[in-house]
Curated annotation (Swiss-Prot):
One of its GO terms (molecular function) is transferase activity. This is Uncharacterized 55.3 kDa protein in thcA 5'region. NCBIfam families: mycofact_glyco. It comes from the Bacteria.
């Protein structure tokens, strides 16, 4: 790939045989990733990214999971996984894994490494907080506004009261502070309309959307604003953590596995990647870009934040997830309300599938991975032999791509093994979450499938507990109970949404050759 100043970076594709997919888990069939997230799919917008030169002083650092070979001239990583070959000049720029932009060449290399997902930004400058307006959409939550506003005392704030029965009075909540403007809707129009009203009323370069049930932690704004020193970034989101992490058992589960908490790892936000979207409970956007993209879709009652992220991405903008910045959320911890909310989230998959074709498959893997997983799951001699044969063929096929590197067979074998584990994880998750009604019917009909389903439900739950365990969190037994209830609720909503829409695209797996 030619960049100003010479051919410094070449991105080696792994051929059309390999899926460009990703989500929360290890790669499957070497270059797929297992998914437990309903909004995961392929990455359709990479080629649309706008050219935007990084400023001098901007830094990047290689992601810790990226593997380097040939003295740093070959990088394997990113999401989806890819191989990048660096010219000696480019490799020298990132000798210790860090690159600072100082000229056009280093800016081009840094941009490509960022967009490939093998590096993360290290901004050197931060826009002023005076350039930010905070928009708080609220309905019938005076207490939440009273709790939130004191944290924002030095910022310009717009409170959008979306038809509350008793009008919200922010001045009562926080007297004597900075500029607070109230925009009232006479009747409730929904959170998207409330956010859009605040967006149109703001006059600053950046708008921070904060729901009335959140509390930002110290330093949240500065950590997020730094990413906007990259002119190609349109949205930044913090990590959503629990406001009360140690209450009831359900509160502790939410602290470990909230659908709003996207984890500890910083990432670009891309459809089909480990962080496919960010929740709108707390985000900062460029105001002009959000207006250009028509803000949030007011016709959507659910998943409007996912749709907004993907439309920004389709317009060529970059989005970042910054987990060092924390915003605490008052999670629902009454079981009936929590269960209903999880089911409500599931109904959002159908409208997303209609708007963003191919972006919400419950499973995404190659046929060879699916075949190997199903064959191995039979636990028969012929099945295990067939699975081994499929894996050996994958190693052979991948090895040819790594000719010229040291130990190409070892590299191919590691990636294949990771892919196989990822495929199993993806299949087990889908059985318990997206396809649990089908699994239930199969369990009734077959004793062998019954044993397999129970083993998958227990094993997947325990592994998920281990990956998300927190100090003071739930033990494995109660965690698995809540995880399975979580999956049943979401899956029920998924099927109901598809049935109501008479559109089954959200239930279709993507199986490639």
């Amino acid at each position: 790939m030619d960049w100003p100043g010479g051919s410094l970076v070449q991105m080696g594709g792994f051929g059309d045989d390999h899926d460009r997919v990703g989500a929360d888990g290890p790669p499957a069939t070497a270059f797929e990733a297992a998914t437990s997230c309903s909004t995961t799919g392929y990455v359709p917008y990479d080629h649309l990214m706008r050219p935007a030169r990084l400023p001098d002083g901007f830094g990047i650092r290689l992601d810790p999971k990226v593997r380097t070979y040939s003295g740093g001239r070959v990088l394997i990583g990113g999401s989806p996984t890819r191989m990048l070959k660096l010219a000696p000049t480019a490799a020298a720029m990132i000798g210790d894994g860090f690159l600072e932009v100082v000229d056009q060449q280093s800016a081009a290399v840094a941009r490509h490494l960022l967009d490939s997902g093998v590096a993360n930004p290290r901004p050197m400058s931060t826009p002023s907080a005076a350039d930010v307006t905070v928009v708080i959409p609220v309905k019938d939550n005076q207490a939440g506004v009273e709790r939130l506003l004191p944290v924002l005392k030095d910022l310009t704030v717009i409170v959008v009261d979306d038809g509350s029965e008793v009008p919200v009075e922010p001045r009562r909540a926080c007297p004597g502070t900075g500029t607070i403007t109230v925009v009232r809707h006479e009747s409730a129009r929904g959170p998207s309309a409330a956010r859009n009203s605040g967006l149109r009323s703001a006059q600053t370069r950046f708008v921070a959307f904060l729901d009335s049930d959140v509390i930002p932690r110290a330093g949240w704004l500065e950590l997020m604003l730094g990413h906007f020193s990259d002119p190609g970034v349109a949205l930044v989101a913090p990590r959503i953590v629990a406001l009360d992490p140690y209450g009831t058992a359900l509160a502790r589960y939410e602290n470990m596995r909230s659908s709003l908490d996207l984890g500890r790892k910083e990432a670009a936000v891309k459809s089909g990647s480990p962080v496919a979207y960010v929740p709108s409970a707390a985000v900062i956007v460029r105001r002009d870009v959000a207006l250009e993209c028509n803000g949030f879709d007011e016709s959507l009652e659910v998943a409007e934040d996912v749709d907004f992220c993907w439309r920004l991405q389709a317009a060529g903008w970059r989005l970042r997830y910054e987990p060092v910045a924390h915003v605490a959320h008052d999670h629902r911890v009454q079981f009936d309300k929590w269960f209903a909310r999880r089911a409500f989230y599931g109904t959002g998959a159908a409208p997303l599938a209609a708007r963003h074709e191919g972006s919400v498959p419950p499973m995404a893997m190659s046929f060879s991975t699916l075949f190997a997983c199903i064959a191995a799951a039979t636990l028969t001699r012929s099945g295990l032999a067939s699975a081994l044969g499929a894996l050996l063929f994958t190693v052979y096929r991948l090895r040819k791509m790594f000719n010229g590197l040291s130990q190409p067979t070892r590299i191919a074998a590691i990636l294949t093994a990771q892919g196989f584990v990822g495929g199993f994880w993806q299949l087990a998750s889908a059985m318990c979450r997206h396809y649990w009604p089908v699994t239930l019917l199969a369990v009734i009909a077959s004793r062998r499938i019954r044993r397999l389903a129970v083993a998958a439900a227990v094993t997947e739950g325990l592994v998920d507990w281990y990956r998300h365990r927190e100090p003071g969190g739930l033990g494995p037994v109660r965690y698995v109970f809540f995880k399975r209830a979580d999956d049943i609720a979401y899956g029920a909503g998924l099927w109901r949404g598809a049935f109501d829409a008479r559109d089954w695209a959200a239930l279709k797996p993507r199986i490639t050759k």
